[in-house]
Every structure is written in structure tokens, then in C-alpha cells.
Amino acid sequence: MNLGALVDTTEWLKQVYIDTAEEEGWKAGPEHFGYLLRCFVADTDEKAIELGKEFMWTIEHRQRGPMEHNDPPGYQSRASVEIKAQRPTGNVAGAGGLGVGLSYDQLRGVNNIIVGNPDTVTQKLTEVIERLSPGYIHIYGNEGAMGHKETMRSIELLGKEVIPALHEVPLRPYDDRPRMDTISSGTAGLAP
């Protein structure tokens, strides 16, 4: 599972998973790959966009300290660090592919934060599913000062409207997907 990296980076990491599985004699597939993203649903896009700004709390508060406090030595194997060093770079990668340094609107633009009414959220999550084909989508649904009432309404809308619609989106086997060396990574959705 990929924990909150940008979709471009996740696409690259998924290919690492596919290649590693193949090298080890396993068949990679959606049933063994998931994606975590921030998502909030409200009755209107405007309300969700406003409440969704609270997703920036972690970046603005908890992750402000020295990097070694967030990712101390020894938390990752040397092999993991080598893989991280190969990640795509550039504007869209933002701090190793996690989007640190990108604005709220930029993170929304690349579907790292998905907010809106049920139709908007369904459309945006469908885009992520069609691109990554994850067997699991994990939703980080509240942060900062989001109110309990609004968070419970988001959960209700996800459960009653969004998730049932997503069950209609087919997952493609990974051997039907283009290899990363044939996919161009870019800054789609990012403001200059």
C-alpha cells in the first residue's frame, strides 16, 4: 500500500511492486495494492472545499520540524532508501513524492486531496482508480479542526453515495497496464 504519495509517484512505486513481484515469481495484481488519500464529502463542493483546507494541518503543524524527526535514521532499510532516491523528481514530486511544499489547490489539482459533493468525489476517485487500479482505497477522512458533525456527514455520504458508485469501476489486471517507461510523468493539474 502507498501511504499518501502523489499519484505520479504511486504509479512509479506500483511499477516497482510489479517488477519485484515478477522477479520473485509472484503475479502482481490489484488485490495486493492499495492507496491512501485525503478525502472529504459535503453536500456542496463549496462547503467541502472550505472544510478540506483542514487537511493542510499536518503539513503546516506536525511536519514543520527537522526532517530527521519525521523520518529518523533506522526507520527504513538501505534498500528502501535506494528506491526512494530513484523516485520521480520535479514539481509534481514535491518532497519525495508526498506533496510537501504544494498548496492546497495544487494537491486538489493532482487528486492527492479529494473534496466535493458526492458526484465530484465519485468522479475524482474514479480518476484515481482508473489510473492506479488499486484493490484498496483507504480514506484519511478528517484532520485539524474539522467538526464532528461535518465529519460524520462525510462518512455518511461516502457510505451511501460514493462507495456504491465506485463498486461499478472495473479494476484492470496489472499485466494490461502500460509500463512506467512508456508513461510520461508531468505536472498535470498544477498551477505554474
Residue spans for each PLM region:
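Short coil/turn segments at secondary-structure junctions
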Residues: M1, R108-N112, N142, M146
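An alpha-helical appendage that flanks or caps ligand/catalytic pockets
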Residues: D8-P134, H167-P192
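A cross-family glycoside hydrolase active-site/sugar-binding cleft signature
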Residues: N2-G4, G34-L36, H138-Y140
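Short glycine/threonine-rich loop-to-helix capping motif typified by GTGT followed
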Residues: D43-K47, M146-L157, A188-G189
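Glycine-rich, proline-tolerant flexible connector loops at the mouths of alpha/beta enzymes
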Residues: A5, I139-T151
